[in-house]
């Protein structure tokens, strides 16, 4: 009887996991490109689809294994049902990554179509134009970045599993890192809380609130009877003045969580009872012990597999690690995408020759993007998280993209001035792109430690050696003395000019923020007091 009743639930959960991980705009566009190339019998150009398949398989595999782990431990704890967090509200990292990929695809698809039509007008075969356009889209939309971010999240999820915490989905790992307030249901907390854990949470900058269903300790100076709260103003005043609430029922707990969110907090909720379900559902991050009520476990993003909350500080740090690594990885890949987009656009509008082929982009990118991103994606970075993922990635990637574009355009112009041949121009551009890529890598890896310093030094040596060893296969030739001097000068100035690019982007960003504030603020005298405006 129980097996028959559970079968539809398992099918529903499997359908949800497949839909959540497969039915994304990124996967749909990549699948359409792959099918198009298959129809054109261009199997050699399907390399970009393998990271997409690996990423989808990794996410689906983790989500299903997490459900199985939660289901197993809950059945040992007396649960008859199979819990799973089914809330469709995406996490900050997941939503930001999806929006960023949509923006890149929104830019890449029209640009690739424009380039394809231009090739057809100039006499190229339609099949070749379509294959070239598909390659443009694949190069502008970094599928490898998505795979590396998922792999980094998986490492963090495994670290949490060692501490007896299971994330209901792969992207749930990051949720607790965004929170600056944690609400505890004291009915569950009193049995297993430790003062050291609560002290560590406070040290990490988290404000703690406690909800009691009965009378709390009268000696506590910060106690509020939740039964006396009626209006939103009373709730707003209460969360600012008190941290302990007695006689808090389910409605009161949900209202208090909502009021904390309205006050600008990102709220995590730890609860195990039926009366916690509404507050858990409303919280930005829901945590529940495995032996909690079914209605509470169903809302959990993170399930505690032991009767303690000692793993909460570790969950905060692992979430920060996941977000910081994803941001660092995104900077490297988005920098290349922005640079490629600008160069493709200039090649179409101004009719400048495109500086390098996809082979040369891949070759230099292997040492300045791919290998460093793999290493940095698994680094332990526990700095607090600030801002939003998309804005942080684009803001940090913009200086590197600006330096790359400036260097490649300068290489093309100097090649014309010096009268270099097409082979010499290609060599000039490859060397300029290598210098810019290494400068960006050295800048991104600050502050330096042994790992980052060794990584940057190793990539510099390997790229320099590879350019010499594979110069024949890459089509590189010797430059005349003037060209060699120009390349040497660009190489020496690359790192200082990267700092100049950062300053330019900072000033532009500050000007944009000030203009936005001027539009929002109509009261005279307010803008003069705003820093930087």
Task: Label the model's feature ranges.
Residues 102, 125, 130, 171-285, ...:
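Cytosolic catalytic headpiece
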Residues 33, 46-55, 132-133, 151, ...:
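Hydrophobic core segments of alpha-helical transmembrane domains in multi-pass membrane proteins
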Residues 40, 47-77, 89-181, 211-212, ...:
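Hydrophobic alpha-helical transmembrane segments
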Residues 90, 99-108, 115, 132, ...:
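Membrane-embedded transport module
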Residues 63-67, 159, 447-450, 454, ...:
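Juxtamembrane/interface segments at transmembrane-helix termini
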Residues 59, 373, 437-441, 467, ...:
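Alpha-helical transmembrane segments
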Residues 1-111, 213, 227-230, 242, ...:
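Non-lumenal N-terminal regulatory segments of integral membrane proteins
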Residues 72, 76, 278-282, 297-298:
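Structural signature of FAD isoalloxazine-binding scaffolds in flavoprotein oxidoreductases
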């Amino acid at each position: 009887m129980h097996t028959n009743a559970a079968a539809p639930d398992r099918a529903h959960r499997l359908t949800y996991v497949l839909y959540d991980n497969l039915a994304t705009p990124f996967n749909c566009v990549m699948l359409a490109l792959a099918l198009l190339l298959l129809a054109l019998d261009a199997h050699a150009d399907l390399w970009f689809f393998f990271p997409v398949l690996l990423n989808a398989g990794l996410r689906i595999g983790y989500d299903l294994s997490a459900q199985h782990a939660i289901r197993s431990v809950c059945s040992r704890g007396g649960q008859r049902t199979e819990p799973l967090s089914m809330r469709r509200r995406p996490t900050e990292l997941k939503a930001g990554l999806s929006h960023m990929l949509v923006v890149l695809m929104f830019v890449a698809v029209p640009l690739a179509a424009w380039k394809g039509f231009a090739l057809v007008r100039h006499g190229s075969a339609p099949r070749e134009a379509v294959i070239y356009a598909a390659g443009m889209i694949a190069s502008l939309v970094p599928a490898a970045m998505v795979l590396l971010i998922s792999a980094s999240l998986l490492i963090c999820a495994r670290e949490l599993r060692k501490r007896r915490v299971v994330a209901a989905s792969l992207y749930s790992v990051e949720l607790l890192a965004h929170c600056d307030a944690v609400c505890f249901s004291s009915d569950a907390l009193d049995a297993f809380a430790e003062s050291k854990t609560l002290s560590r949470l406070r040290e990490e900058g988290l404000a703690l609130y406690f909800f009691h269903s009965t009378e709390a300790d009268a000696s506590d100076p910060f106690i509020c009877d939740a039964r006396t709260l009626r209006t939103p103003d009373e709730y707003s005043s209460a969360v600012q003045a008190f941290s302990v609430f007695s006689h808090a029922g389910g409605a009161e707990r949900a209202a208090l969580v909502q009021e904390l969110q309205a006050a600008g907090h990102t709220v995590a909720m730890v609860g195990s009872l039926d009366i916690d379900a509404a507050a858990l559902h409303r919280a930005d991050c829901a945590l529940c012990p495995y032996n909690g009520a079914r209605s509470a476990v169903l809302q959990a993003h993170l399930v505690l597999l032991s009767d303690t909350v000692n793993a909460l500080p570790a969950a905060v740090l692992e979430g920060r690690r996941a977000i910081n690594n994803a941001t660092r990885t995104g900077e490297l890949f988005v920098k290349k995408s922005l640079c490629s987009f600008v160069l493709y656009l200039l090649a179409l509008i101004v009719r400048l020759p495109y500086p390098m082929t996809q082979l040369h982009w891949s070759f230099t990118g292997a040492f300045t993007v791919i290998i460093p991103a793999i290493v940095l994606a698994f680094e332990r970075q526990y700095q607090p998280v600030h801002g939003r993922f998309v804005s942080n990635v684009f803001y940090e990637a913009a200086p590197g993209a600006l330096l790359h574009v400036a260097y490649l355009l300068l290489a093309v112009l100097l090649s014309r001035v010096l009268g270099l041949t097409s082979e010499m121009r290609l060599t000039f551009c490859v060397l300029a792109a290598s210098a810019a890529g290494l400068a960006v890598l050295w800048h991104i890896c600050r502050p330096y430690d042994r790992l980052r310093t060794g990584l940057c030094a190793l990539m510099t040596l390997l790229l320099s050696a590879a350019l010499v060893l594979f110069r024949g296969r890459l089509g590189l030739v010797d430059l005349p003395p003037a060209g060699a001097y120009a390349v040497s000068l660009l190489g020496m100035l690359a790192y200082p000019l990267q700092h100049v690019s950062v300053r330019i982007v900072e000033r532009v960003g500050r000007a944009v923020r000030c203009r936005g504030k001027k539009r929002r603020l109509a009261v005279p005298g307010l803008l003069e007091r705003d820093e930087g405006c």
